[in-house]
């Protein structure tokens, strides 16, 4: 036995159970405001229960998981944590809507070296805000305090979401055809992708995050939360024959649009159909980033690209605008030759 007779505790090892309990008490109100009628029970159980909505005849569950990448580093540097949870929810639920799914419930994982209750409560409050926007319930989560794994009060977050769609209404891209119109739905900024390049641009250029750009600081532009498209997109899906939806995330246009296209088709994008939001122009200028690389890394102002019959495009754009979205016709689907790139930006 060791010569040290003092009694050790979990807290001595760097894990504060009392802080964890305090966090649970703090977030109960936030969780409650996300509740859906299908949710059974409250938080704190070993598992969370949720019934399927009764309106579905042949329900298909759609799942997704994601994080927010190195946008977290920016939030930590700026000590602003109340919207990063919105980003987390958005990155998950926007992937579900691509297949026509209505988000049902969401769970989060929060890992840190030393739990700061105020910071964690801000993050969870943001998650609840995102769930309210998406119409899904925050039904559970995990907070892991792991001394030695993370530096100080640094943290990481991950999210997991489950949605539901009628089997016959699954959007899988199989209806995409040459002649379809492509609609863009505007983004709120870089969303949660490309932040390693953004941080490199800030470092190399020596730019000040407090510098003003179009009435806001650079930092405010960069921490603008990811737009959640669920409610407007569900209305569009209800009214129109949607052939495919692409969520423009990591990999930009070149990587994400081909994921929903059939072999032998390509997306022809009119690069003059919209003006990049000013933050993307600033990033390109400060980082001397080539235009192709911008489209490969960032959404450049486009959060979703939607394929649908050409004769429905104008009505769909009008509906999206009524729902508060910035939407426009951005291009069309065309036939592609063998081995031809599936995205062409003119």
UniProtKB/Swiss-Prot annotation:
Taxonomically, which superkingdom? Answer: Bacteria
GO MF entry, a single one: phosphoribosylformylglycinamidine cyclo-ligase activity
Quote the subcellular location field of this record.
Cytoplasm
| Major localization listed first in the record, in broad terms | cytoplasm
Q: What class of enzyme is it?
A: ligase
Read off the PANTHER family from this record: TRIFUNCTIONAL PURINE BIOSYNTHETIC PROTEIN ADENOSINE-3 (PTHR10520:SF12), TRIFUNCTIONAL PURINE BIOSYNTHETIC PROTEIN ADENOSINE-3-RELATED (PTHR10520)
Q: Under which name does UniProt file this protein?
A: Phosphoribosylformylglycinamidine cyclo-ligase
* The species this protein was found in: Vibrio campbellii (strain ATCC BAA-1116)
The UniProt gene name for this protein comes to purM
